[in-house]
Structures are given as C-alpha cells and as structure tokens.
C-alpha cells in the first residue's frame, strides 16, 4: 500500500497510507503531539435534505462558510487530515478551489456526503475522486439501493459507509456485510436536531443502540474494516469486545489529544462538533490546538 504522508509530530512519527491507515510510532511509552493531526471541518450549514437527527441543524437556507479566507489554513502542515462536512458540502461554491488549495499545501482532505447528495451530484463527487482532490469519501446511508451502492463502492476504493448507532438497525448492517465495504459507526449525537429527535423517540433509539452493542462481536467478524468515532466507542463499549493488544493497536486517542473541530460558517473551533465550549477562530492553527489540548 502506497504511503502518502510521513512526518514527525512531537515525540513520535506518523505514516499515513492511501487506504486511510494511520500508524503512529516511537520508542517511548507515550505519544505526545506538538500540533493537530486531523480535524473535522464544517464548511456549510446549507442542506436541502432535512435529516431528522442532524446535529448541525443544517437547513436549505443555511449559510456557506468563507472558506477561502481562513488564515489558519495557511499554517496547516503537510500530512494534516481534514474531514470536510456540512451541511451539503457539494453545494458550496468554493469547494473545488478550497480542495485545490489544500492539495497545494499538502493537506489530505476527505468529504462526507449524504447518499441523496451523492446521487444528486454524482459527476461532481466522482470528479473529486478521479482528480485526487479528496482521498476519502464518507457516504451517509439513507436508503437501500443496490445499483447506487454497487457502483459507488466499485468506483471508489476509499469509500466508507457512515452508519449511526440508534438510527440504523440490523437490516442495514446485514445489507453492507455482503458488499465488501468499510463502515464507520458514529455515536448518536444528542445535539441539534439529534436532541429533538431523542426527546420524541428515546426508547426506539435506545433499543437500536442496545441491539448494536449486543451484536458488536458478531458484526466485527462479518466486516473486513469497521471503525468507530469516540462517541460510538463510548456508547457501544467497544473496548469490551477487544483484547488489550487490539485496543492498544487500534484506539487513536481521546478527542482533543490529536484532533479538533473547526466551524468555518460561524468562525469557531472546539474539541468536537458537539462541544458547547467554543472559541473564535485564530490566525494560527497551533495556537488553536494549544487551547484544545489545554482543555483536556
């Protein structure tokens, strides 16, 4: 597998490969970073799809972020990963210039799109992949559609299906188990419209989370690659189904130790997208990350 980035961060080295695999290593008993390795970056709050659980509360009249003039972008180091989301990222008028700018400074971007957004902007998304303006493509499941999913998976080797604990049930997990695709399980976010939905359907959501938690060991045997965000790791008690060696190898660290969240619409940054404590953007990414680390 081709290595696309190699750098030193604090007291350790990082290797990043084109399939998304990341390896951190040193000869010490700790990994202490000097600068941020990866960030979630919201570029738009505009979205026509109205998902009931959207924690960003994106709407059809939501604003786009001023993504070409954020000063901290110029201070990002080569190899930094940026997971770009929204809102509907494909609707941002500066998406392609922004991705080209990131590529020119060595930043490694990925985007997350809703399944319907991908279908509505099929040529654009495929262009981003073909021109290597993005290295990763996350697609949030909304419906069963063999033609769509088979073509999307075939044409995008780095495609990852995003599924949400509490929203997607066993039928969805069984569906993708036979398609040879990577999945990312996201924890249920009690934030934004996600909070409103939880107030209305708490029992159903909890049943789905409990089902996933109880069937996790079985699912791990069905998929070649399953990953989790830290919220899902907590909600599903993922550590309990792994050996100590597996946990040590695969766990990437607590939120805010190597990562952060940036909202280019509201010009704020925080530890995660559900953090209530937020700060105004600064001109230097290192200063921003120091604030995040200081709050851990």
Question: What residues fall within each predicted segment?
Answer:
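Radical SAM enzyme [4Fe-4S]-AdoMet core and its adjacent flexible, acidic
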Residues: 133-286
